[in-house]
Amino acid sequence: MSWWYRRSIGETEQKRIEINGVSPTYQSVALIVGVTGIAGSGLAETLSFSDTPGGPWKVYGVARRPCPKWLAKLNVNYVQCDIANTDETYSKVAPLTDITHIFYVSWTGSEDVALNTLMFKNILDSVIPNAPNLKHVSLQTGIKYYWGNMAEMDSTNQPHECPFYENMPRLKQDNFYYNLEDLVYDSAVRKNGLSWSIHRPALIFGFSPCSMMNTVSTLCVYAAICKHENKPLVYTGTETSWTCLWDAVDSDLLAEHFLWAATVPNAKNQAFNINNGDVFKWKHMWKVLAKEFDIEAIGYEGKEPVLLEDLMKDKDSVWDEIVKKHDLVPTKLRDIAAFWLADVVFRNKETLCSMNKNKEFGFMGFRDTTKSFVSSINKMRDFKFIP
């Protein structure tokens, strides 16, 4: 029974590597770029376990903000760096000459093709010439590979219809995902023997209080505000998004997917979709969210959708009250919640990705999406980021 399958059914020990003042011997050295985000933090946690394939792992974590306290327990060697700055990136990352694996899970927070491309290029240019033992480059993109920038769609440029398959052609529009993937292909040419993998996740369910792409924390904050104001949890999106099928990926499963592609020879030099292996509807998940916060759930009722970002625009002080009342870790509303992301999701249509290629190449990891959703909420509570 593989480690990945045992993780999926909860039969791994998940014991962390113990340092105890002794310099351990590492088999692999990871550079996680975007370590404070939802994917990066999940990967850092998975690499901290003693039974993780390829380990024991030494971990460097790069992010722009100061190292958060919740990340410190994972034994990450933190590198605060603005990777949009070429000189700063080289000065801070090039000296890390023992790197064996790059895991790139960062973006600038916009669709800026040039800036996102520069950021990844700065990392590759800093590591590839200076890390003689570099073996593998992992890149996270996503399902925007298939449906692109909706604002640029017209009659001659339409998104692919789902289910999405990895061999679908690129859309006829600018998309920084395409540029990043091209940089991956180029990196394999630059260094002989360097392997790569590209990961295209669905919605990511997981833990991070400072991620620009955390649907769970955003909805938790919305629910907490509704409860604080004695209001029901109202679904703000369209009928289509309410009733259609969705897929998501647990951040732990995503981390396992990264490790599988980086350590199993058969999986290298490929692009893969990644999701939990099941589907869900928001009409069902909405009740789960409301139950977790003990409030009334009101679903789609035929009304015009409203922007959650507009509803929450004057709620900064309300969130401050909630943080104080429940003695939570201090956060600002705009840091812990990305209401624009919820608005994108709640105005979209089904985005289902095929997992057949994963099975053909041997990846059998999975998660129950409802359990993943609840687990993510509980983890946010355990770290005292939500009431």
From Swiss-Prot:
Q: Which residues bind NADP(+)?
A: T36, G37, I38, R64, R65, D82, I83, S106, W107, Q140, Y177, S211, M212, M213
Is Transport included in the keywords of this UniProt record? no
Residues bound to substrate are K144, Y177
Q: Which Pfam families does the entry mention?
A: PRISE
Q: Which GO terms describe its molecular function?
A: oxidoreductase activity, acting on the CH-CH group of donors, NAD or NADP as acceptor
> Sorted alphabetically, which Gene3D superfamilies does this protein's record hold?
NAD(P)-binding Rossmann-like Domain (3.40.50.720)
* Keyword Nucleus in annotation: no
Its Gene Ontology biological processes? terpenoid metabolic process
- Name the active site residues: K144, Y177
What does the tissue specificity note say?
Expressed in leaves.
The entry's keywords: NAD, NADP, Oxidoreductase
Superkingdom is Eukaryota
Give the reactions, separated by semicolons, that this protein catalyses: (S)-8-oxocitronellyl enol + NADP(+) = (6E)-8-oxogeranial + NADPH + H(+); (S)-8-oxocitronellyl enol + NAD(+) = (6E)-8-oxogeranial + NADH + H(+); (R)-8-oxocitronellyl enol + NADP(+) = (6E)-8-oxogeranial + NADPH + H(+)
Query: What are the EC numbers?
Result: 1.3.1.122, 1.3.1.123
Chain's role: Iridoid synthase that catalyzes the first step in generation of the iridoid ring scaffold using the linear monoterpene (6E)-8-oxogeranial as substrate. Reduces 8-oxogeranial, generating an unstable product that is subsequently cyclized into several possible products, either non-enzymically or by dedicated cyclases. Iridoids comprise a large family of distinctive bicyclic monoterpenes that possess a wide range of pharmacological activities, including anticancer, anti-inflammatory, antifungal and antibacterial activities.
- Family label: Belongs to the short-chain dehydrogenases/reductases (SDR) family. Highly divergent.
According to UniProt, the name of this protein is: (S)-8-oxocitronellyl enol synthase
Organism encoding this protein = Antirrhinum majus (Garden snapdragon)
